[in-house]
Swiss-Prot record:
This is NAD(P)H-quinone oxidoreductase chain 4. One of its GO terms (molecular function) is ubiquinone binding. Its EC number is 7.1.1.-. The lineage of its organism: Bacteria, Bacillati, Cyanobacteriota, Cyanophyceae, Synechococcales. HAMAP family: NDH1_NuoM (MF_00491).
Length: 534
């Protein structure tokens, strides 16, 4: 009987359920009564988000083999055959950790949205649709379907910014949609070009595209377009300017979704499409990714250091940390690429925690200016402890996830022999500047908020209530995996080792056949540097 039950679980459409269940459930919300403060809607949304998280955990436990490098949990149903469009979903080691991260962060974001009283039905409707849409981005195995889910996710974010944001919410929401929707046209063009390549019958499935023998010029053309589209979402400097504005106007739960999940879509897409499907072009552009990653780290760290607005300071900190993802993807090292994957998971947790605390602090002080938000440590001691723990995680304190991921990226890039030694030394030295700046601006931020000169107007006019149990619980849920990964990284790295090794093997083959430049040393051994077993 247990065997039959296990067989039933293995055949269950886990990924389709994790996508369609929250989206379908969202359409029940309009039938809730409008009276009251939306308590019923909040509990309903939380139950749906938690169930979705359990479904994704079930997919990992019952149907995912960490030693299998191929796509698993595959579901393939013909949808619009005349257009070559199929409902094709699946998960490998690159997508599964991000699927789990999405459902986990969304459940906590729903809990973070508990104080929302303005149009709660629409708010939680959008959150649940966003949950299913973001899981779909990581799960779909068809490039045209990927484009559709990528676009679907933009609508809830736009409305969440435009309706529940700050006083400049319309500007921030419009800028977000112009940047992201405008750049998405390159995804559609690349999908059509790759799907129709060499045939009159289109096929957009990843497995088909990976087997195609695209010419180098064709790959470069598609690579550039996709780099722009995904670079906006990551974001890559100078395509980043929408992010500080969006974070500057968003509410705490939307902050968590932006920092925890949305930025990871760009990093995932670079791995999935640019590195995996276009290896010849990736061999040519990988040095540029390294340079862009270093620029991200230094520029955003310096800009964050100069910010006097708390939300914008943390927003630029996020941009800086995503620079490590670019370096890892461009490293041609299994260790470095594995570090990029871990950095996405790690920053998803850390970024969500910091932005939640930003929102919680603003709810009490009603200001984001560091000059006005000073000396509140005596009034909010628990909040100070939570801020300290999350800030230490962000500055990559040993024993926390950020330290391991950044160390893996640095070590993978510096020790790999694909690039010349001078290039590696120069890039690593420059990136180290950003690493040094991070603790400076984060610790000085803590000092200003909690131990600066007390603002009498703030402390007398505002009732500065310390962190409540709901807030402590949310941060505890985020800190637990942050510390767990920091102490035992294999909790996450084992899930994607096989897929990362397969990806790097494909890219190294392209490097060996590429025209040698003064950046590549050409001394890479035939053996592939295996991903870490730490």
């Amino acid at each position: 009987m247990l065997g039959t039950l296990g067989s039933g679980f293995s055949n269950f459409p886990w990924l389709s359920a994790s996508i369609l269940f929250p989206i379908g459930s969202a359409f029940v919300i309009p039938f809730f009564p409008d009276k009251g403060d939306g308590k019923e809607v909040r509990w309903f949304a939380l139950s749906i988000a938690l169930t979705t998280f359990l479904i994704t955990v079930g997919s990992y436990i019952n149907g995912f083999d960490i030693n299998n490098e191929n796509v698993q949990l595959k579901e393939n149903v013909s949808w619009l055959p005349d257009l070559g469009l199929t409902w094709s979903v699946g998960a490998d080691g690159i997508s599964m950790p991000l699927i789990l991260l999405t459902s986990f962060i969304t459940a906590l974001a729903v809990l973070a949205a508990w104080p929302v009283k303005f149009k709660p039905k629409l708010f939680f409707f959008l959150i649940l649709v966003m949950d299913g849409g973001q899981i779909a981005v990581f799960a779909v195995q068809d490039m045209l379907l990927f484009f559709l889910t990528w676009e679907l996710e933009l609508i809830p974010v736009y409305l969440l910014l435009a309706i529940w944001g700050g006083k400049n919410r319309q500007y921030a929401a419009t800028k977000f949609i112009i940047y992201t929707a405008g750049s998405s046209i390159f995804i559609l063009l690349a999908a059509l070009a790759m799907g129709f390549y060499g045939t009159e019958i289109p096929n957009f499935e990843f497995s088909h595209l990976a087997a195609q023998d695209f010419t180098q010029k064709f790959q470069i053309l598609c690579y550039v377009g996709l780099l722009i589209a995904f670079g906006v979402k990551l974001p890559i400097v100078p395509l980043h300017t929408w992010l500080p504005d969006a974070h500057g106007e968003a509410t705490a739960p939307v902050h968590m979704l932006l920092a925890g999940i949305l930025l990871k879509m760009g990093g995932y897409a670079l791995l999935r499409f640019n590195a995996q499907l276009l290896p010849a072009a990736h061999a040519q552009f990988a040095p540029l990714l390294i340079v862009l990653g270093v620029v991200n780290i230094i520029y955003a760290a310096l800009t964050s250091f100069a910010q006097r607005n708390l939300k914008r300071k943390i927003a630029y900190s996020s941009i800086s940390h995503m620079g490590f993802v670019l370096i890892g993807i461009g490293s041609f090292s299994s260790l470095g690429t594995s570090g990029a994957m871990l950095q996405m998971v790690s920053h998803g947790l850390i970024g969500a925690s910091l932005f939640f605390l930003v929102g919680a602090t603003y709810d009490r002080t009603k200001t984001l200016k560091l000059d006005e938000m000073s000396g509140v440590g005596q009034k909010m001691r628990i909040m100070f402890a939570l801020w300290t723990a999350c800030s230490l995680a962000s500055l990559a304190l040993p024993g926390m996830s950020g330290f391991v991921s950044e160390l893996m990226v640095f070590t993978g890039f510096v020790t790999d022999e694909v690039y010349t030694l001078p290039f590696r030394v120069i890039m690593a030295s420059l990136a180290a500047i950003g690493v040094i700046l991070t603790p400076i601006y984060l610790l000085s931020m803590l000092r200003e908020i909690f131990f600066g000169k007390e603002n009498p107007k703030l402390t007398e006019e505002r009732k500065l209530i310390d962190a409540e149990p709901r807030e402590v619980y949310i941060i505890a849920c985020l800190l637990l995996p942050i510390i767990g990964i920091g102490l035992y990284p294999r909790l996450v790295t084992e899930s994607y080792l096989a897929s990362i090794n397969n990806l790097v093997d494909r890219d190294l083959t392209a490097v060996k056949s590429a025209v040698k430049t003064n950046i590549f040393s050409g001394t890479k051994k035939n053996e592939i540097l295996k991903a870490p077993t730490i």
